[in-house]
């Protein structure tokens, strides 16, 4: 999966859910998705 840049964790959640993942958070300016 391509790295998704982010500023805050709340912007990762919809992007991760769009990839079929349950949740996600922002770490080191990249989204980390938990599938």
From Swiss-Prot:
GO cellular component: extracellular region
InterPro entries in the cross-refs: Scorpion_toxin-like_sf, Scorpion_toxinS_K_inh
Matches recorded under SUPFAM superfamilies: Scorpion toxin-like (SSF57095)
Tissues where this protein is expressed: Expressed by the venom gland.
KW Isomerase (keyword) present: no
Disulfide bond among keywords: yes
Free-text note on domains in this protein's UniProt record: Has the structural arrangement of an alpha-helix connected to antiparallel beta-sheets by disulfide bonds (CS-alpha/beta).
Free-text function comment from the UniProt entry: Selectively and irreversibly binds (K(d)=2.9 pM) and blocks Kv1.3/KCNA3 potassium channels of human T-lymphocytes. Weakly blocks Kv1.2/KCNA2 (9%).
Protein name as annotated: Potassium channel toxin alpha-KTx 23.2
Protein's organism: Vaejovis mexicanus smithi (Mexican scorpion)
